[in-house]
Amino acid sequence: MKFSIISVALASAITVDAHGYLTIPFSRTRLGAEAGLDTCPECSILEPVTAWPNVTEAKVGRSGPCGYNARVSIDYNQPATNWGNSPVVTYTAGDTVDVQWCVDHNGDHGGMFSYRICQDQELVNKFLTPGYLPTEAEKQAAEDCFEKGTLPCTDVNGQSCDFSPDCQQGQACWRNDWFTCNAFQADSRRGCQGVDNAALGSCFTTIAGGYTVTKKIKIPNYISGHTLLSFRWNSFQTAQVYLSCADIAIVGDSASTTKVSATATTLVTSSKTASASCTPAATVAVTFNHLASTSYGESIKIVGSISQLGSWSASSGVALSASQYTTSNPLWTATVSLPAGTKFEYKFVKVSSEGSAVTWESDPNRSYTVPQSCAESVAVESSWK
């Protein structure tokens, strides 16, 4: 009993410290920060709650699956001018994609995290309707649905899916479908920042600078013109849970579209999405949004297995624009028109100021399939590895 009292007191004393939010794909929280409305995107906190060792015990309350930031009084469960009105990225069912969140330097309290997709479109639509704020009962119902739709770490071939070093076998946290941070008290590569071991400032936070935490997820065999990817981080040291979400679309590839669309529960329409009678796009404008910190004079190119990306020749690759680049958000972008259904592998490269030295990303190659749908444009989010 003494331990419990001390633990609660300790957690209460340091609850202001843990901070993090979803950054790739662009979450509603990130969009709120980039619009200048959220002055602390890492501060959407559900507290005090039981966050450990049972990582699914806590009810989400007003935080919902998308998060509530009490510091700036923003409820991300409701669409607003700068978020929630349309997907920020389109994925293909069955694809493996990069996802990333940002943990603040002063707020890395270890723990475990998960990515989730709720396949109850009627319920999700309550979080997509402009002017409507879901009730707490609807928020919890959605959270329960997202929990059922957890995208297991183990679904991605070759991905390391360890058990948390801060959890003991037999505890509720002893599961590797969720992703784990490194040991909270590790001597090196500690906590969540140790997952990528990226440099301080590799992602944006307002308190002390952030560290990226990057993983891969497999998109489920589900089609939606507009749905949500929810992120949940349970802190190990503090009684806190962090939630955020991103608006996404999921299309089927040529082999699965007919099969998946035949199930009435997975086909989605909305005022923002083309109807089923639209003409499929022959070519798609694929925008690559890539985060990569560079030195003065360096540039970024995308090089790949198809001719439009230089056929693996760095000199023939597509140069990305740094027009939106900032120190806190080192964004490089390029848009390439590609035939629908095109499958390819690719990497990003850094080119020196003289153009003579080229640094390639680490293996493995990235892969992508251009959606075959009515959408004429899609965005692909990533960061340097």
UniProtKB/Swiss-Prot annotation:
Binds 1 copper ion per subunit. The modification Methylhistidine is found at residue 19. InterPro entries: Carb-bd-like_fold (IPR013784), CBM20 (IPR002044), CBM20_glucoamylase (IPR034836), Cellulose/chitin-bd_N (IPR004302), Ig-like_fold (IPR013783), Starch-active_LPMO (IPR052282). The keyword Cytoplasm does not apply. It catalyses: starch + reduced acceptor + O2 = D-glucono-1,5-lactone-terminated malto-oligosaccharides + short-chain malto-oligosaccharides + acceptor + H2O. Residues 19-248 form the Chitin-binding type-4 domain. It is found in: Secreted. GO terms for molecular function: metal ion binding; oxidoreductase activity; starch binding. It comes from the Eukaryota. Starch-active PMOs provide an expanded perspective on studies of starch metabolism and may have potential in the food and starch-based biofuel industries. Residues 278-385 form the CBM20 domain. Its cofactor is Cu(2+). Its main location: secreted. Residues 1-18 form the signal peptide. Cu(2+) binds at residues 19, 109, 242. One of its GO terms (biological process) is polysaccharide catabolic process. Starch-active lytic polysaccharide monooxygenase that oxidizes the C1 position of starch substrates, but not in cellulose or chitin. Catalysis by LPMOs requires the reduction of the active-site copper from Cu(II) to Cu(I) by a reducing agent and H(2)O(2) or O(2) as a cosubstrate. This is AA13 family lytic polysaccharide monooxygenase NCU08746. It comes from Neurospora crassa (strain ATCC 24698 / 74-OR23-1A / CBS 708.71 / DSM 1257 / FGSC 987).
